[in-house]
Amino acid sequence: MTTHNFEHPLNEKTRIYLRVESLLRQAHTAASFSEPHQHQLFFRSIFDLIEIFEQIQLKSELAKDIEKQRLLYRSWLNVEGVDQATLRSLLDEADRTHAALMQAPRFGQSLKEDRFLSSIRQRFSLPGGSCCFDLPALHYWLNLPIERKIEDARQWLDSLKPLSDALNLWLKLAREAGHFRSQTALNGFFQSDAEEANILRLHIPMEYGVYPMISGHKNRFAIKFINFETGQACSQDVHFELAVCS
């Protein structure tokens, strides 16, 4: 059975984390520059990340979240019934990630100070603004050897490695905290309580031809399935898999 997978954040912090994860993934995928116009996706992702960093103290939020995990793991040390080898491995990873995060400069600072990136950032956001007559410096860079472009991209992305490592760890732990269970949306509607949840994860069979519209917060949520072809609320029962991740 073919399914499409969907994630929905239940608080603003997690919403930002998922957006940053998506932008980092896009930037890494496009950094090979193996296809025409991949530079568009790469630079747009980088500039979107810079804009988020300018608005939110992401480093301090992530540091607090990783620290909470470290304290939780330490409370489980020597507790009977807990796999101590796995626990110590997770604690070591959390310790390393937290230390690297605390030593890192403010996220995106080196990107903002990069002469080339700063020279193209403003015009890049204009509709069609990446034409050679708008951004001659970008046009020159695009004609550099592929090895040079890949190396530049690697250096820019490496400056975000402490962020990427911390974010990947927190999201991995959050996702693994939830377990998929079979659910049924009666007449295309489902609602439930959630205790301090961060993310909803859904596996929805494609055969229904629907996508979810989700509203809610960390303690309660509702899912309404919408028919893709009509844009109207689905009136049939939808069987799907749901994980509520705290």
Curated annotation (Swiss-Prot):
Q: Where does it localize? A: Cytoplasm
Q: Which UniProt keywords apply?
A: Cell cycle, Cell division, Cytoplasm, Septation
| Entry's Gene Ontology cellular component terms | cell division site; cytoplasm
**UniProt keyword Cell division, yes or no:** yes
Which source organism? Vibrio vulnificus (strain CMCP6)
Annotated transmembrane regions: none
| Quaternary data | Interacts with FtsZ.
Concerning its family, UniProt says:
Belongs to the ZapD family.
Q: What is this protein called?
A: Cell division protein ZapD
Taxonomic superkingdom? Bacteria
* Entry's Gene Ontology BP terms: division septum assembly; FtsZ-dependent cytokinesis
Q: Does the keyword Cell division apply?
A: yes
Function of the protein? Cell division factor that enhances FtsZ-ring assembly. Directly interacts with FtsZ and promotes bundling of FtsZ protofilaments, with a reduction in FtsZ GTPase activity.
